[in-house]
Structures are given as C-alpha cells and as structure tokens.
Swiss-Prot record:
Any one Gene Ontology molecular-function term assigned to this protein's record: nickel cation binding
Domain of life: Bacteria
Protein name: Urease accessory protein UreF
Function: Required for maturation of urease via the functional incorporation of the urease nickel metallocenter.
Assembly and binders: UreD, UreF and UreG form a complex that acts as a GTP-hydrolysis-dependent molecular chaperone, activating the urease apoprotein by helping to assemble the nickel containing metallocenter of UreC. The UreE protein probably delivers the nickel.
Positions with biased composition (Low complexity): 83-95
Species per Swiss-Prot/TrEMBL record: Mycolicibacterium vanbaalenii (strain DSM 7251 / JCM 13017 / BCRC 16820 / KCTC 9966 / NRRL B-24157 / PYR-1)
HAMAP family named among the record's database cross-references: UreF
Length: 214
C-alpha cells in the first residue's frame, strides 16, 4: 500500500477503532447551546482544530519522528498527559489509542505494540501507526487533525439532524486549515490548551445517558 493510500485509510471514519463513539465535546456543546447550527458548528470545529487538533497532531508527529519515546510511561505518555488537563479528555484519548492499537496489530504485526502498554494515548498510537505505515510525519499529523475535525462534525450532524451535504461542505471549507495546522504541528510540539474544551469534557461525564462516550 502506498503512503498516500495509507493516509486515506487512517483518516477514514469507518475504521473500527472506536472513534465513532466519541464526539470531541460536541455533544456537551450541543446540550449547552453552544453549537446549534452550521455556523456555530463551523466555529467549534475551527476552534477544535486550532487547539486540541494542533496539540494532538504535534505529539503524534514527534512520536513518529522518534523525538518523543512511545513506550508506556516514557516521555510521549507524560507529554500528552501534561497537555491534556481534563481527566475525562485523557480517558477518551487513551480509549481511542487502545482502539487504534487493536487494529494496528493486525495491519502491522511486525511492530512492537506491546511496548505502548494497554492504554496508550491516541497521539502516541497514531504516531507509531503512521511510522509503521510509511507515512511522513506531516501526513501523520494531517490524519490526526482531519479525524479531529470529522469526528466532531459527524457527531454534530447526528445530534442536530443536519443535512449531511451541508456538514460535508463545512469540512471541505476547513480542509485548508487542517493542512496548515498539520504543517505547524509537524514542526514542533505545541503546548497550548483550551479551557472551554476541558470544561465540556468534564461536564459530559455528569450527563445522564449521553449518546457519545465523550
């Protein structure tokens, strides 16, 4: 498989990694009246791409390059924890990382996945998977940023009963931002945070019978 095809597959929302049960805070944002239509969804996605998307992608790119060790308990793990203030967001990250590793074991069995531990962060797992798949670090970053956007967009589509074509048009419009963010993420580790996204992640835990895990 070519590196471009691998990039497309890793960015496919149909991958059985468990990502479809996470909304990236959109469910809580919808419940709180922060995301109510296409315009507010676009604003939310833009904010998420520029913050958590950038940070997660920068960690994945660093793991891919080898500048952050991927082994459980090493710098990759610690740096991701340090950049994820919300315990709920950390748990969601590790759940998605576990799902990605479960699939990656089948695709690249020669890779040492055991060294990542039972619940690696998504950024760490994505970095190792991108390297195993022969991607360049910036393409690994792009797959992370893109799925950060599309996961939340699809969740909002379901929660607000939005027209799928309209939501797709929003993601097309934000594609240049995804590319720019991935390029920035591949340069160096990002260390910003977004208190709103952290609050939404924590408040989601208190919601009764949520549709999404996060």
């Amino acid at each position: 498989m070519s590196s471009l095809a691998t990039l497309l597959v890793l960015s496919d929302s149909r991958l059985p990694t468990g990502g479809h049960v996470h909304s990236g805070g959109v469910e809580e944002a919808v419940s709180s009246g922060l995301v109510v239509d296409l315009a507010t969804l676009r604003a939310y996605l833009t904010r998420r791409i520029r913050t958590s998307g950038l940070v997660t992608a920068s960690l994945a790119a660093a793991v891919h390059r080898g500048s952050l060790p991927a082994a459980a308990g090493e710098a990759g793990d610690a740096e991701t924890d340090a950049r994820t203030p919300s315990p709920a967001a950390r748990a969601a990250s590790r759940a998605q990382g576990r799902g990605l590793v479960r699939l990656a074991r089948r695709v690249w069995p020669e890779q040492d996945w055991d060294g990542l531990g039972a619940t690696p962060h998504l950024a760490v797992a994505a970095g190792v998977a991108g390297r195993a798949g022969g991607l360049a670090p910036d393409h690994t970053a792009l797959s992370v940023v893109y799925t950060t956007m599309t996961g939340s967009a699809t969740a909002a589509q379901r929660l607000l009963a939005l027209d799928p074509g309209d939501v797709a048009a929003v993601t097309f419009a934000l594609s240049p931002l995804c590319e720019h963010t991935a390029a920035e993420a591949a340069k160096e580790l990002a260390d910003l945070s977004d208190p709103l996204l952290d609050v939404l992640a924590q408040r989601h835990l208190e919601r009764e019978r949520p549709l999404f895990a996060s």
